[in-house]
From Swiss-Prot:
This is Deoxyribonuclease-1-like 1. It comes from the Eukaryota. One of its GO terms (biological process) is DNA catabolic process. The active site is at residues 113, 164.
Length: 312
């Protein structure tokens, strides 16, 4: 081109601009949307009563723990009325919608406790529930089983089976939990089942050799997503993986994002003494993606850059 001749910028077609914007928007939706997860938790709240929760420090911590979860399964709720749970729901309802579902009081002696589901009613609903019929009295507190909807086309519902074992019968109860799985999966034709709670599945209550011989360990398809060796206790003097989450089903596996204990004393900067006023256990939790795990975020970032370069 002769020097001095004016150079006019090339006009970018509107269709090109629109396509570029669509690619960027679509990939960003995938990148950001992939981080959205549904959290299911289990927590041995250590003899939860109204007298305990009306203490401000305990109530504040419990509400913060509960607010993290889309479904929380509480154990050791020993209130014969609904007052404890209703009080907690009143504190939670300020920002989001919550409902609850509870079992009857369970136990063989004068000491009895409930299983209580507290859940985000704007994100999930109860489809079915029942108290397992423990005809042989194997369980001290037989599972209170519930089926919940999930915000996922891959897995529209999941079954939760909570259990708080008694320490002297851990092995027997955990082996019987396999029968509960068979019962519920046949009853509702759903093999996407999460077994969770304070199993007492470690230390003096269950030696490693006995743990590895459990039916839930030897039968195919069960995934213990809280690792052996993960401390689920608050006391510095103990290091035991009592609390567990066991998942079954292809849908659960496809949507699994993460599983962990929640170290609430560390998160909320509590001393051990302060934390023990709430519980001597950490909550355990599992996060499910709303869509199947597909392209990892770092690959999506690379794909975004490549797509933009191809568009010029």
């Amino acid at each position: 081109m002769p020097s001095g001749q004016p150079v006019f910028p090339r006009r970018v077609p509107d269709a090109y601009i629109a396509m570029r914007g669509l690619v960027v928007a679509s990939l960003l939706i995938l990148l950001v949307g992939g981080t959205d997860a549904f959290r299911i938790c289990a927590f041995n709240a250590h003899r939860l009563t109204l007298t305990k929760v009306i203490k401000e420090s305990v109530m504040d911590t419990l509400v913060q723990i509960l607010a993290r979860c889309d479904i929380m399964v509480l154990q050791e709720v020993v209130d014969s009325s609904q007052n404890t749970v209703l009080f907690l729901l009143q504190k939670l309802q300020s920002s989001k919608s919550y409902s609850f579902l509870n079992s009857s009081l369970l136990g063989r002696s004068t000491y009895k406790e409930k299983y209580v589901y507290i859940y985000r009613s704007d994100k999930t609903q109860v489809l079915n529930f029942y108290q397992y019929n423990d005809t042989e009295d194997i369980f001290a507190r037989e599972p209170f089983v519930a089926q919940f909807t999930l915000p996922s086309k891959i897995l529209p519902s999941v079954v939760l089976v909570p259990l708080h074992t008694t320490p002297k019968d851990v092995e027997k109860e955990l082996n019987a939990l396999y029968d509960v799985f068979l019962d519920v999966s046949q009853r509702w034709q759903n093999e996407n089942v999460i077994l969770l709670g304070d199993f007492n599945a470690d230390c003096a209550s269950l030696a490693k050799k006995r743990l590895n011989s459990l039916l839930l360990r030897t039968k195919a398809g069960f995934h213990w997503v809280i690792p052996d060796g993960e401390d689920t206790t608050v006391r510095a003097s103990t290091n035991c993986t009592y609390d567990r989450i066991v998942m079954h089903g292809q849908g659960c596996q496809k949507l699994l994002k993460a599983a962990a204990t929640f170290d609430f004393p560390r998160r909320f900067q509590l001393t051990e003494e302060e934390a023990l006023r709430v519980s001597d256990h950490y909550p355990v939790e599992v996060e499910l993606n709303k869509a199947a795990q597909g392209i990892p975020p770092h690959c999506l970032s690379t794909l975004l850059l490549l797509s933009l370069s191809q568009l010029g």
